[in-house]
Every structure is written in C-alpha cells, then in structure tokens.
Amino acid sequence: KYPPNHNRPNLKYGDEIHYGCALGLINNRPGTCSKLGVAKHAECRSLKNKRYAECYLYGIYLYNQLTTDLKFHYTTIQYNFNQVSKKHKDKKNIGESYIVAIGDYVGGRLKVWKDEKGEGEPEYIDIKNKLYKFNGSKYYHETEEFVGTRISLVYFSIL
C-alpha cells in the first residue's frame, strides 16, 4: 500500500487523495531548510523502510529492463498509485523525464501538449509497460481516465 501524499494538491481533482511517494533524492521545503539548517536536497527518509527500499530497487530494475538510453540520469522515482493527474507542468523537475505505467487497467494514456502554453489538442501516448521520454517541466501533461489498477513510475532529476 502506498502512503497518502498531501504535498501535491495541484495534481488532483477535487478532494481525492493522491497515493504515492518519491524515492531517491527529494527537495526539502525551503522553510525546513532555513529553520533546521538542512540541505536543499536530501535522500528520501522512506528508503530506510525495507518496503520502500525494495520499491526503489524494483523501479531501477524496471527502468533497466525497458530502456536503451544508458546516458539518461535521474535522481528520483515518483510512484503514483491509481492517480489521474490533472493538467500540469512539473515545477521542480530538471530536464526530461521518463514515465511508465504498469498494472491491470484500460485507458490511462499520458496526454502531452506539445505547445508550451498547453493549448490545442494533446498527443495521447500509451505508456503501459513502455517507457516514454518527455520534458514534463516544459510541456503540460495529464493522465487519461482509466479503469483498473494502475501504477505509474516517473524517473526524473532535481539536480
């Protein structure tokens, strides 16, 4: 089971709860950094939990099984459980990301607007069991509605 993630309100519709977690390097909140004197970036504390450490290793394994892009560098893997994200840009990601979705579901394609303003018709990309590379900090994107169980993994860098 994935924990509720209350730090991403811009991604959800209405009062729904987003379940998922970021594993790897994460951004500390600016207030936390100055109050506690901690670094801007830190290794996710969840990795000390055996289950999350296993999820992180599985994410690395899955990426390595599906990719031919050996030069791509990521610092973080974002797990999303049954999440339909609304139209957004990734504010803290740097450069391109890879995304893949796994599970027993129908629908759930990634919608990407190639216009930086997010206008016009989106491109629909089937990411079920396939990695797709795109710049989520540059282009608006969202999840198509789906039925079933869907877990998406987003590989990105914050450095």
Specify the residue positions occupied by each region the protein language model found.
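Fe(II)/2-oxoglutarate oxygenase catalytic core
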Residues: K1-Y132, S137-L159
